């Protein structure tokens, strides 16, 4: 007869979780469900996802980004910029098996909580990092969220709207996939530590996960002549669509002078900065757009105002300006364009498989480990190639 509290695979393991929003917390949630003790580290007042809510008839607003991915965790609130908080986190990390973090590259090092800082005190610590773009070079240190990463990785142009507008995926596909990949990588690192005594530094980039999800489609463009440089599609006469339920506007594809740009600026400070950069500071005080929820309710009017301002520059000009000022914006690339971008090359996302004339280029799996290169370049086997090895009678 089963016991009321059966053993779980991660019983006795402690995880220190510095992540927020969706992808990182989902990885922590997987570990909680497998038995780990996960201590969530939040800023005073709690992480931002606690405030992103949806309204359902007859009940208070639900924090639909926060609630599904933080079940059973423990929470501490600290200001990581203070020396007291740093010392508290160092002591906690001394007792942990895993650290999860998802800040922009270099942030934890500036706080004195990077992998070298923590692992010099706790050599058995596995340090798992989630980033938007990998932090591998000049194109990889930008901030990014699901919508923008998906667009830049080619996910929004394969099935455009009837008007030609990039199709925004209506749920957090890249976030959720990245969370599961990060959890898988942590489990592999724990097994590596238990079997081989190696405590690894694990890295997962959401962009790499998004590319990996489209490996079949991108392979077609990796194994033929080079494509043209990325360029926005011509702007069609677009119809308006209804507002969305989540209070995360503006987060969509918007028309510019020559095509579409994908922008996510729903955080209050980002919204204010966007308004000033596009020359519309008056929108900050406009009551229709004063809060996240009102911007969502008045989505059609919001889109009209933004596109009126964005019509003054090309999509590429806006991307350069907004990114230079720390906002999340990108072109919605096609698959053909993705494989020719500097970011794609910077993240070392391809493998040469096979030999000679049979060599093909494929997409590698996204998780990276400091202690070994997680790739195999042998070609797939022919059907039944190993029958004699495994099916022969002893």
Curated annotation (Swiss-Prot):
Source species: Mycobacterium tuberculosis (strain ATCC 25618 / H37Rv)
Class of enzymatic activity (EC top level): transferase
EC number: 2.8.3.-
Active site: 175 (nucleophile)
Keywords assigned: Transferase
SUPFAM superfamilies per the UniProt record, alphabetical: CoA-transferase family III (CaiB/BaiF)
Task of the protein: Probably involved in fatty acid metabolism. Binds to fatty acyl-CoAs of varying carbon chain lengths, with the highest binding affinity for palmitoyl-CoA (C16:0). In vitro, alters the cell wall lipid profile and protects mycobacteria from acidic, oxidative and antibiotic stress. May play a significant role in host-pathogen interaction.
GO molecular function, a single term: transferase activity
Protein name: Probable fatty acyl-CoA transferase Rv3272
